[in-house]
Structure formats: C-alpha cells, structure tokens
Design a protein with these regions (language model features):
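Internal, well-folded beta-alpha domain core
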Residues: 29, 88-269
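N-terminal short leaders/motifs
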Residues: 35-51, 84-102
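Long, hydrophobic/aromatic-enriched structural stretches that serve as scaffold segments
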Residues: 55-58, 63-97
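Hydrophobic, proline/glycine-rich low-complexity stretches
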Residues: 1-73, 217-220, 227-267
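Short, surface-exposed, charge-dense and proline/glycine-enriched linear segments
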Residues: 5-10, 78-90, 133-139
Length: 269
C-alpha cells in the first residue's frame, strides 16, 4: 500500500510509532456537547484515566455521522461495509501518568454487525449493533435515527441537524479554544475485558467546523450509562468530511480496576 504523507504540524505530540492500521472517512458529523460535573463523569472512567476539563467543566459529546472509505491495511474490504451510519457517546480524558490527552468512548453504535465485531475485537471499544438510518434533507441538513438492537431497554437517538456554513471563526479550530478542546484529540482510550487500559493513536488534519442547528427529539445514550444530561441547549458544531487514520491498539498497563473514584485534571489556559 502506498504510504501517504501526513500533515502533523497541528499535533501536540508526534505521530505514533509504526504504521497506521486503518483508514476511514467520516462524513456529515454533528458534534453535540453538554457540560457535566467532573465527578459524575470521573466515576465511570477506568483506573488510569482522569477527566480532562475545560474551564472547570467535563464535557459529554454525542456525535452522529456516517463513514465510508474504510480500509484495513493488508485486508480485503469488509463485506457490506462500504458505508454505514455511526453514533457515539464520548468524553475527554488524560492518562494520569503521562498527561496524554484523548477521547474515551462510553458507547458506539453502528449498523454493520461485522464492523461492530471487528472494532470490539481489535480496539476493545464498546460497540453496539443498531438499527440506523441517516437521510439527507438538503445540502447540509440531515435526519438521523438509531435504535440499539438486542437490549432490554430501548436506547434510541433521533435528531435533525444542519450545518450553517463555514465561518472565519471556525475555519480551523485553534489551541486554547473550546472547539480545539472538543475535537483535536489524537488518542482513544478503552479498557478490555481483563480491566487493562489500552489506547490507539488517531490522526487527521484539523477539523473543518461550522456552526450548527439541531432538533434532538430523543437521546437515551447518556441515561443508558447512568448520567442525566442537563436540561440546556448543547454546544453544536457540524463538519462535512474528514479522513482519519488509526494505529493499532496497544496495552498501556495491566491489571486495572474497571471503575474507580473520580479523578479530575484541569488544563492550563
């Protein structure tokens, strides 16, 4: 496979060692973010991770989108995975030993069962198989629906959203802004069934963000993990498209408890 020269000037750390393992393209994303208390989020994190905060607040993000151009290095295309919708619930963390910032996913829903199985096996991520659809209403307007399969209690997300077009303020998120804090993350963290903390490197160019509007009719994702979202309008952004590179998951350290008391860190600036 031909190697691609990657832009790295925006990264706070060098690229991970070795070669990337997978590429994907993420399309028509809504970033919906709510402030949360650090303690409420921290109690759900695995040992070894701290809540990363912006101006004293933790943040929970719900991100619906659809992906395509999925390629695993050295592996034929995944059957039926040419493109499919995805939905995730995430927060922002640091490794308490190294300070490395990243994303921690509480849940990820996808409509392709084989892709769910591969992601669970290779990246230890909490993927769920879901009935999903995304319908384009206009150039930047979408209707999104997700209902998790094989669960006792329905976990449903239903929303309409639209991007409002690029602005100079959001043309490219800058360090120190909330937009940068929420989107410029280059590692994902998870814990496997043995309670071991794992991480994987991610690479992309800076997110091209737009302001957005959304009508969220139903959102059960946070309640499914025991968090009540505040009754307030979320911070909304839209992004048209971004190519993403993922490195293999690696073990950070063994023998961790899957849950512990909250640990919180506030970034400088």
């Amino acid at each position: 496979m031909r190697e691609i020269k990657l832009r790295t000037s925006q990264r706070p750390r060098p690229l991970p060692p070795g070669r990337w393992a997978m590429t994907q393209r993420w399309n028509d994303l809504l970033f919906a973010h709510w402030q949360a208390t650090p303690g409420a989020v921290g109690r759900l994190l695995p040992e070894g991770l701290q809540v990363d905060t912006f101006q004293g607040s933790a943040w929970l993000g719900v991100v619906p989108f659809w992906m395509d151009r999925i390629k695993i290095r050295g592996v034929p295309p995944i059957p039926g995975a040419r493109s499919f919708p995805e939905l995730n619930l995430r927060t922002y963390v640091r490794d308490h030993r190294t300070g490395m910032q990243g994303v921690y996913f509480f849940s990820l829903d996808a409509s392709n069962l084989l892709a769910v199985a591969i992601a669970r096996s290779c990246y230890h991520l909490p993927y769920y198989w879901a009935e999903m659809r995304i319908e384009q209403q206009s150039e930047r307007e979408f209707a999104f629906y997700s209902r998790r399969r094989l669960t006792r209690t329905p976990v449903i997300f239903k929303a309409r959203y639209r991007g409002l077009g690029p602005t100079r303020r959001l043309a490219e998120s800058r360090s120190g802004t909330l937009e940068y804090f929420l989107t410029e993350r280059y590692y994902l963290f998870a814990h496997n069934r043995g309670g071991e903390l794992v991480r994987a490197g991610i690479h992309h160019v800076p997110w091209p963000l737009e302001d957005a509007e959304a009508e969220i009719e139903r959102n059960d994702l946070a309640e499914a993990i025991g968090i009540q979202l505040p009754d307030q309008q979320p911070v909304l952004h839209y992004s048209r498209r971004l190519a993403v590179y993922l490195w293999p998951a690696e073990l950070v350290r063994p023998a961790l408890s899957p849950r512990r008391a909250p640990a919180v860190v506030t970034p400088s600036g």
